[in-house]
Amino acid sequence: MAGLGRLDPGPRTVMPAWKREILERRRAKLAALSGGPGSGAAPDGPNERLVLAESLGPLSQNPFMRLESERRRGARPAQQLLELYCRVPGVRTIRADNILIIESAPGFPPAVPPASSIRAAEVVVYEEPQPGRVSRLLEKFDSPAAPRRRGSPERFRPALPQLPVAPASAATRAPTNRSLAPAPPVLPSQPAPPISPVPVAQRAGQRSACCEPAHPDGTAGPGARRSDFLQKTGSNSFTVHPRGLPGSAVNRSLSNGPMTQESPAGPANGLSGSPPVPGKWKPKVESKEPSLHPPPSPGTPSATPVGPPAFLAPSPASATPSQRQWVSSATSANDSFEIRPSSKPDMETIPIGDLQARALANLRVNSRNSFVLIPKRKAPGNYPSAAGRQFEEPKGEVGWASQSQGLGSQLVSTVDGAPALEKSSLAAEMQWAVREGGCPRPAISDTDKSVRRQRPASPPPFLPATTEAEPAEGLGVPGLTKNGQEPVRPGLPVTFIDEVDSEEAAFQEAKLPSSAVGVPSQYHLHPSTPGHTSELLNRGSNTFTVVPKRKPGTLQEPHLSQTNGQFQQGAEEQDADSLSGPHTTLENALKKRYPTVNEIEVIGGYLALQKSCLIKAGSSRKKMKISFNDKSLHTTFEYPSESSLAQEEAEEEEEEEEEEEGEDGEEEEVGPDSEKSFTVLLPRATFVSSVGPESSSGLSSYTPKHSMAFSKWQEQTLVQAPTEVELPPKEVMLTPASQNDLSDFRSEPALYF
């Protein structure tokens, strides 16, 4: 036993302490991983195991993983919230990178309780989306060729027998298959028609409507009858008109029948009552264009609903369809909405904590072009005249129109949301502006009454100038009453459109008295628009020059004349210029515009600059400039040597009286039109535009090379007169000595202080 006791500590004494500690740590790690306690672990074994357990831990408790999961979880509802609010009528959404501003449209009516029964004027049938990734990609990118080829009304003939012979079980099974639509099943009391009743599947939480059975005469030829009842409305949806499309006078009289005013969304697709006669206006499908309602991409802040196309944001140029279809002076009255100058908001009434409201109000305060778009409604019985005028109502108000007026008494033109018409409609509005001779009025392209989005910082397309004499009539008088139009009815949602000018003149206009006549002074044309440019800066037959440096007199006179409502006189002068260069004006209008300091407000308590200290053009700047030649910066200036400077200091004591007399004489010689330089002592180096023989650049001044020829400048630096007339040290200052020198400094690349 004694020998065994001696053999046991033998290896222990041979093994070093550091090696024994490593082994103990290894045993502790193995015990922690296997779950059992280590038999030969040292006293620090359990501590080591606890440290490992705390450092690793489960991944669900990792703080980094937890933050990442919370970020993903928070980003998902933001996208869903954006898409949801974009489809809600009466709500305007403005989305930036990480900001979503949601505000209710003013004057939008309250929600209507669901109706017990609805007599449908049209039925919207949605096809089941194809399963798989390919269909989702097709829906995301919305390729228009495949859906039109598959489900367009003209090529939908093979599927005709499926509609009349559809079993009743399919109609009752449809609500259960479509979980997105809480549609009640078809009423069993209704008789079975040739076309089985199909529930209207409405997504995004909107209530689905149970409609009455339709009774088209399905016994006729399928090709002849299908085009009268079907209309393609999207990649996977089409519209069934039970009473038929308005192809004849009988259908038109039938479609003007009464309709229950309790429909919350009105008929789908924005067609209230009966669409106009196909001779006047044809849907998008018949003109072989992309589908009427393309489903928006999930990542884009589109206001177009994915589900029922009852509330759609019109395309940028579709605010006035009559002007898009018939470009003539007969349709220039713009009977769908009215533009009025908007008043500036009161910043004192906005609470300080509401940063978003203050930012929007500041944008409107600093904008030169602020509009209020007020939709107009015709009285019952006023149909479009023979000239082709149509009345368009915003999509967000179709449901309300069905409550306040009979839907059969209105004609609402369907506005397509496809961006393919932007170029053609923009050219049409340009042509309209040329024919009218008026100044195209800029406005933000999206003139939807229920959704407001911010456009990128580029000059927007032109909105027709329909309110030529509005500012003179004041805010209370509608600008279109002179054309015989009815006044605006109360309760309609209006849209405010603000356009911030890119120059300093925005603040000059904001300083003008705006309460004199009751008209805001910022209501005038954008100075960079083609109409304004051709009026002020037309240099040739078809050349329009944009010069940012402009005197305040020439800048404010046309603005005042336009504010007083004198648009027609400028329109007559610009008619020939607009006719000669429409392409140039369009090119100038679509140039990229960068935001200026006037458009940027630092939210967070730093500073909101009213003007830039580095702005290039402006009437209130100081005349001090620093000019450099960009090509020869390294050899532009030459400073005197130390020896010549010491020699100059010795001569200063002898010639103090001559210096004062020479300074007076030099000030008399330099006039407003003479090109002379002035000299200051170092280190206050002066900036000379040109050098005359009287005052050469000597020891205490330098001469820029670009102001004269290089040979003369070289000779002048070699032959420097030591007895140079100089300023006394007490007159060293930042500004020039004489005020007459202010007009001598002109150079293009300059900094203004």
Curated annotation (Swiss-Prot):
Subcellular location: Cell projection, Stereocilium; Cell projection, Microvillus; Nucleus, Nucleoplasm; Cytoplasm
Residue ranges with Acidic residues bias: 648-672
Polar residues: bias regions: 230-239, 250-263, 323-335, 559-571
Recorded GO CC terms: cytoplasm; microvillus; nucleoplasm; stereocilium; stereocilium base
Principal location class: other
Name this protein carries in UniProt: Taperin
Organism for this UniProt entry: Rattus norvegicus (Rat)
Phosphoserine, modified sites: S274, S402, S458, S502
Bias kind Low complexity: ranges: 300-322
Gene Ontology terms, MF aspect: actin binding; protein phosphatase 1 binding; protein phosphatase binding; protein serine/threonine phosphatase inhibitor activity
GO biological process: auditory receptor cell stereocilium organization; sensory perception of sound; stereocilium maintenance
InterPro entries registered for this protein in UniProt: Phostensin/Taperin_N_dom (IPR025903), Phostensin/Taperin_PP1-bd_dom (IPR025907), PPP1R18/Tprn (IPR026671)
Gene: Tprn
UniProt keyword terms in alphabetical order: Actin-binding, Cell projection, Cytoplasm, Hearing, Nucleus, Phosphoprotein, Protein phosphatase inhibitor
Biased composition regions of type Pro residues, renumbered to the chain: 182-197
